[in-house]
Every structure is written in C-alpha cells, then in structure tokens.
Amino acid sequence: MSPIIDALVPMVVEQTSRGERSYDIYSRLLKERVIFLTGQVEDHMANLVVAQLLFLESENPDKDIFLYINSPGGSVTAGMSIYDTMQFIKPNVSTVCMGQACSMGAFLLAGGAPGKRYVLPNSRVMIHQPLGGFQGQASDIQIHAQEILTIKTKLNKLLAEHTGQPLEVIERDTDRDNFMSADQAVEYGLVDAVLTHRSA
C-alpha cells in the first residue's frame, strides 16, 4: 500500500493484560473471521484473500468465515484461485455483497456456502460472459479464443450448479451484461437472502 492509503486505514487500539495493542481495522476484523474482497480481482489481491482463508482454516477449521464482497470483477484465473480455495477449505465461507458484485465478483458471491450467501438491500449484482483480448499471430489468437470459450463453458456450468438454474438459462443470461437488484439476485439463486438488519 502507498503511504497515503496507509494513513487512511483506521487503527483500533485494544487494552490487554500486557498493555495496549493496535491493529489496522482489517487485521482486527480478520480476528473475527471477516475478510474483505474489494476492488478489482487480480493476482495480488487474490493471493491475500487465499492466504487469509487458509490462515482462518488453520485457526479454527469448524467456524464459519465471512467474505464481504464489493467488486467490479476482474481476472478469471485470480478469481478461480479464490473460488477453489473457498471450496477446498473445511470452514463454510459465508458471502455478503455490499455495493456491487459484478462479473467474477458475482461468481465468488454465488460460490459461498449454500444457505449462507447474502446481499445488502441496495447492492447490485451483474453476471456476463468472460472478457478477453489478445494480440499476436493468427494461430495464437485462435488458441486464446478457444481457451475463452472453454472458460465460458466451465463458468456457466458452475453458475448453474450454484444457482439451480438450467444451463441453457445461464448461457442466455450471461451472453450480455445482466444487472440484478438484491431481490432479483435472490430470485435468480445467486444468493439466499437480502440482509437488512443483523439478527439479534
């Protein structure tokens, strides 16, 4: 992080028997098993999220992890590293959309533990087909085009599994940018409920 960004991250000071201990707010929330996935999904961010998931599993493999998502999407391979880790680890990963979960963000939102995927009421969710661009020789472009189609098929099959929608519906609905409100995301099966208040 840049020094300017570091200065904007709040610090939390706790009193312990051994004196004061200060944490940045994200580290303090990590103690409560809360992980933030915000901004563009890319390799560096994915590595941090994966490391936090693995750390929390080692701390307690039987306690839920909460993944808060506010993302416009990003790299498919970076997103799949997070997704595969979510499925691999023992704790349930509860996903919560705040703001937006678009593209790979929506895919990760849907990949949370069944019954534990949530969206806040004024958030938006967007699904679409993977994007790609490549330059080079015609044969290389053809190889990359085929790879994008393979990835598209894989993502559609996984979305069908997580939403309960037929594959042909997913294929149709991801053909172009498809925005949904919180209630529409629940109806579609991307999430299980809209959260308006914390339960008592």
UniProtKB/Swiss-Prot annotation:
InterPro entries: ClpP, ClpP/crotonase-like_dom_sf, ClpP/TepA, ClpP_His_AS, ClpP_Ser_AS. Gene3D superfamilies: 2-enoyl-CoA Hydratase, Chain A, domain 1. GO terms for cellular component: cytoplasm; endopeptidase Clp complex. Its EC number is 3.4.21.92. It is an enzyme of class 3 (hydrolase). Keywords: Cytoplasm, Hydrolase, Protease, Serine protease. The active site is at S103 (nucleophile), H128. It catalyses: Hydrolysis of proteins to small peptides in the presence of ATP and magnesium. alpha-casein is the usual test substrate. In the absence of ATP, only oligopeptides shorter than five residues are hydrolyzed (such as succinyl-Leu-Tyr-|-NHMec, and Leu-Tyr-Leu-|-Tyr-Trp, in which cleavage of the -Tyr-|-Leu- and -Tyr-|-Trp bonds also occurs). CDD domains: S14_ClpP_2. Disulfide bonds: none annotated. It comes from the Bacteria. This is ATP-dependent Clp protease proteolytic subunit. It comes from Vibrio vulnificus (strain YJ016).
